[in-house]
Amino acid sequence: MNRTIIEKVRSMLCECGLPKTFRADAANTAVHIINKYPSTAINFHVPDEVWFQSVPTYSYLRRFGCVAYIHCDEGKLKPRAKKGEEKGSYLINRIVSILYTIGIGKTSSPRKASHLGIKG
């Protein structure tokens, strides 16, 4: 299983062009996705369904590294959404409390956001 996770992380980071600093977020997302799909170890049942005894939802899943716009309330005449650098902000993962981790720009650290528009 460890090799599977590492391979998914490597491919996710290569596909969207994110730096290695996002490895932990990519690993978290990879494990989250693995737990949402059927597993041969438990007779093709979904691990989340077995653990929580309810059908998992997939509607919130987005492509790793897609462009995301954070809703801002900085003032009446200021822009209502922030986008990262030219490559875009990076949507990393949806967390249990309906927060997304967003990395904006090259130097800023990832932020958590709940009000955002997602493109892609």
UniProtKB/Swiss-Prot annotation:
Disulfide bonds: none annotated. Keywords: Mitochondrion. The keyword Lipid biosynthesis does not apply. GO terms for cellular component: mitochondrion. The keyword Mitochondrion applies. Its main location: mitochondrion. It is found in: Mitochondrion. This is Uncharacterized mitochondrial protein AtMg00710.
